[in-house]
Amino acid sequence: MKTSMQRKLDQLTTRLAELNDLLSREDITSNLDQYRKLTREHAELGPVVEHYALWRQAMNDAATAQELLADASMRDFAEEEIRAARERMDKLGAELQKMLLPKDPNDDRNIFLEIRAGTGGDESALFAGDLLRMYLRYAERNRWQVEMMSASESDLGGYKEVIVRIAGEAAYSKLKFESGGHRVQRVPATETQGRIHTSACTVAVMPEADEIGEVEINPADLRIDTFRASGAGGQHINKTDSAVRVTHLPTGIVVECQDDRSQHKNKDRALKVLAARIKDKQSHEQQAKEAATRKSLIGSGDRSERIRTYNFPQGRLTDHRINLTLYRLDAIMDGDLDELIAALVSEHQAELLASLGDAD
């Protein structure tokens, strides 16, 4: 292990002891914001310090066994102990290196997941519905909570656009690599000749702002329109102007919400989605600046970037960013995304490790 890494781990061990002391103080526990911030830091540091303690134990075991080498009757035992201790040190050292990688500050946030039908008309809208079901099934497997924020249904089923809020542990960290273009190749239900059609949807995964105030929105920059909610095909489903459209004039971002009968609730939801979209836009602008110096294999999360192809006749999914092909499309469409997400996270970690190596 590098001296710089060991020094960092020693600092974290000291910091954890400080946090234990702080969290037992009454003036800290009475300040909810401060207490929440410190408990979050404590939860992050705990596993790292625990791993480091195991690494030091393995190092001490190796040192103790080294002393036994001088005794001929103990040499075989000592060599085996040294080998086992060094194996543990290597394994724990690699895990610690990953644990020390810079954390995305948004990783623990809830998300807004937005799916938009793209090229392909009705078939694209049907695929948007299939993608939504895939993510909802994955959310179910993770025991996450899902709330429908806005939906524009198409005539044949599926969605022209749909936005859901997903709340739960590590929602953003697991789904953040889903942003981009998703292409489908299959025979549509409406196709009589059996020809394979290609259509596409775009997915955007946006971290939820902790509070709307976290993103500065000047009320003077907003135009709020109310209108009558409508269902698929344009038929009116509500006789009051409960639907809300919020336009953020400086960015041109528009959010519509009409899923609730209450205008107040629709406005509240629209403002939450707007805050997330503005935050997402700011993040992408920052990432674009960084991408100018280092191109990420995982990609920029740009919606125009095609990231994945779903080929139904072959039962094949291909993620173009990491050249991964899986022949288990049915299971994936049923929400079994663990293998795919693990591969993307692993590639991202490898990139971060490589960039840290370059920095050294």
UniProtKB/Swiss-Prot annotation:
Keyword Cytoplasm set for record: yes
Keywords recorded for this protein, A-Z: Cytoplasm, Methylation, Protein biosynthesis
Region of interest (Disordered), ranges: 280-300
Positions where N5-methylglutamine occurs in the chain: 235
Gene Ontology CC: one annotated term: cytoplasm
Gene3D superfamilies for the chain: 3.30.160.20, 3.30.70.1660, 6.10.140.1950
GO molecular function: translation release factor activity, codon specific
Superkingdom of origin organism: Bacteria
Pfam families: PCRF, RF-1
InterPro entries tied to this protein: PCRF, Pep_chain_release_fac_I, Pep_chain_release_fac_I_sf, Prokaryotic/Mito_RF, RF-1
Entry function: Peptide chain release factor 1 directs the termination of translation in response to the peptide chain termination codons UAG and UAA.
Protein name: Peptide chain release factor 1
